[in-house]
């Protein structure tokens, strides 16, 4: 009997699958990589040997395995990470703001949050990358989460120089996080009287690289979508999107 272990769960092969696990993952990643909006379009392109409903259920089900693969890639990236790292978060709306009060699929996870672009209803994606753009850590939280409260748990296994924007400025965070092997450097606000050294300024100039990760995930890998009709569908979309980006 074939068994694929993902954490404490087992995907057991009892009755033969109409479509293999490898094909399920490949189709899901193809959808994200090519920016295809719906699973229906993928089904019509490849015409797999199963029903459309079976394909949708399988893609959502095996997102747990995709998440396991993603975590393995993150751990591998951590081993050879650059000393300079960037931490930031981005908004992931689950629906249009005008439809938020009627939204049901993600009502237990989505919350109202605010960014520099305005209000949104959904989640936040927090990530840490190194100077080479490799993903080192990630976490999904409700949209109203304070970035500073996530920072320490997100980067607990990492060392080096951590570059962050002004939203992470906190004396308590610096006191808690800074050690002999790691230090956080937050970009000062315009109204703050803080003098930067040349090397600090040079490091801060590299922070825009993490914005490219968010831009690519949203524009080219379908991170944001309001089409799923269930919690599993939404989280599967996020997992496959990030995994496809890491495998690019």
Regions found by a protein language model. Name each.
Residues 1-248:
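Short alpha-helical elements
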């Amino acid at each position: 009997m074939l068994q694929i272990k993902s954490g404490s769960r087992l995907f057991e092969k009892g009755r033969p699958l109409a479509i293999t696990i490898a094909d399920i993952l490949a189709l899901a990643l193809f959808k994200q990589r090519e920016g295809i909006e719906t699973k229906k379009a993928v089904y019509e392109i490849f015409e797999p040997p199963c029903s459309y409903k079976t394909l949708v259920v399988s893609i959502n089900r095996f997102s747990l395995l995709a998440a396991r693969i993603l975590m393995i890639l993150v751990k591998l990236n951590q081993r050879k990470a650059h000393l300079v790292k960037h931490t930031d978060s981005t908004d992931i709306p689950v629906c249009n703001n005008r439809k938020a009060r009627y939204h049901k699929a993600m009502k237990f996870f989505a919350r109202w949050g605010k960014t520099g672009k305005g209000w949104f209803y959904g989640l936040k994606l927090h990530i840490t990358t190194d100077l080479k753009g490799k993903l080192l850590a990630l976490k999904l939280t409700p949209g109203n989460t304070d970035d500073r409260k996530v920072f320490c748990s997100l980067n607990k296994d990492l060392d080096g120089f951590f570059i962050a924007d002004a939203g992470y400025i906190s004396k308590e965070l610096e006191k808690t996080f800074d050690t002999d092997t790691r230090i956080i450097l937050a970009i000062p606000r315009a109204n703050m009287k803080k003098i930067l050294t040349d090397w600090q300024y040079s490091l801060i100039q590299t922070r825009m690289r993490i914005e490219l990760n968010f831009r690519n995930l949203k524009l080219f890998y379908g991170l944001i979508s309001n089409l799923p009709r269930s919690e599993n569908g939404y989280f599967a979309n996020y997992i496959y999107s990030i995994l496809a980006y890491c495998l690019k």
